[in-house]
Amino acid sequence: MAAVSLRLGDLVWGKLGRYPPWPGKIVNPPKDLKKPRGKKCFFVKFFGTEDHAWIKVEQLKPYHLHKEEMIKINKGKRFQQAVDAVEEFLRKTKGKDQASSHNSSEEKNRRNSSEERGKQSAREEKRKASLSEGKLKKGTGEGKKRVSSVSSERGSKSPLKRAQDQSPRKRGRPPKDEKDLTIPESSTVKRVMTGTVAGFKWPPSVSEPVKDSDPHFHHFLLSQTEKPAVCYQAITKKLKVCEEETGSTSIQAADSTAVNGSITPTDKKIGFLGLGLMGSGIVSNLLKMGHTVTVWNRTAEKCDLFIQEGARLGRTPAEVVSTCDITFACVSDPKAAKDLVLGPSGVLQGIRPGKCYVDMSTVDADTVTELAQVIVSRGGRFLEAPVSGNQQLSNDGMLVILAAGDRGLYEDCSSCFQAMGKTSFFLGEVGNAAKMMLIVNMVQGSFMATIAEGLTLAQVTGQSQQTLLDILNQGQLASIFLDQKCQNILQGNFKPDFYLKYIQKDLRLAIALGDSVNHPTPMAAAANEVYKRAKALDQSDNDMSAVYRAYIH
């Protein structure tokens, strides 16, 4: 097949990493967004997903030539919305082109009419002048003098009048009341902003808005630029125009998880063990995105809701692993993770060569390394993938996934990670994800303790806690986490979104991690003591924000 030339403005199908092809348009990147070195690539704005990314030429295909092929292999709702947006955009653009052609024709007719009226006026003036000259020749001397005077006076005005009436028309200009309001596009602009691919000419505008665009998929891959802050400002400014034309309000990290609605679910059978706060939301999203899921939970009643949604029931962890291709597990702590694998009818009994096990629990590096060794010793494949987030983010499919271990298995889990999270990171060998997750939760737990300490200090010094929150929300610390946890405290609502006992467990494990490399963690140690006091006050099963009560009792 002959190579197809692509240019700025072309509509294309773009393939980004392991994600399915998606309709987009080649556009100009912001000035501060550097182009990747190496192979030729184009900056593509994807319809409907809010994505912008550099895509290599070999990963781009002309939209019209491959439309039927792509529609057959992609069936997601979000994908169909994107295709509809492209088609609507093309229909409207075609209508605008026809209207422009019609207006140009009318304008040409008006100009021709004006020129014709000018010529008729000139002929009439010439005829009148000829008649006047004939009368002068036949008149008396006095008459000649009088007529000559009048004729002279008329002759002094007529050329001026004729010049006024005719000169603009001779140049083909319309009268002032018929002024052409169309601003012609320069050939240079037209050449830059439009292009031809396989015989199709693409208009310079961008697509129309996609209805129900998901507001969650809105963050940008700043690692492509050496000046993240400057780049973010530049691209935000540049995309204000695109916002009006496409409904795009922000940009998504292009090398991470694609839009949930566009997922092509894997044909592999998925198992899931553990339906707690996090696991329940994860399974729900896997089912919504079309995955075949078998579930198991220590308390079987929790499985009922998911059975109604289309999941299958596994009687034991071993049965789930033996009947599924990839089995995920999300349990509370290291002991629960080990019991699930090594206990009676556990995961290990169902492992055979080729079976895959993904542990999403937040545990220490030693525990996850031990689990990996026993799984691999039976011929299985292992991946650790703890998640950063809370119950709400789990329900929304907006978790951050930290993975390490078998890279091939990480790729095989692509559609699952897309369903449950907004982005995923592969961190290398087993143990790295566990360490990173503990560090993340150490920072989060320490921050929560500091928030509670600040609110209680405001109270005892006679300051308004609400005013403190308002001030924090207007400053550099402003975040959804800060606002939600402060609201929990102000309203006295400690319904668990992230159990206090689990954040204290993570702090303890993070401190042990620091001890193992002789690294001091005094802030985490202090926060850990406050959480231990809160647990002593019977706050273990409340949200982590209940640490506030450790300061007021």
Curated annotation (Swiss-Prot):
Residues that, per the record, bind NAD(+): 271-285, 362, 505
Pfam families the UniProt entry points to: NAD_binding_11, NAD_binding_2, PWWP
Lineage: superkingdom: Eukaryota
Keyword set, alphabetical order: Chromosome, DNA-binding, Nucleus
DNA-binding segment(s): 168-180
Assembly and oligomerization: Homotetramere. Binds to mononucleosomes.
Protein family (similarity comment): Belongs to the HIBADH-related family. NP60 subfamily.
Protein name: Cytokine-like nuclear factor N-PAC
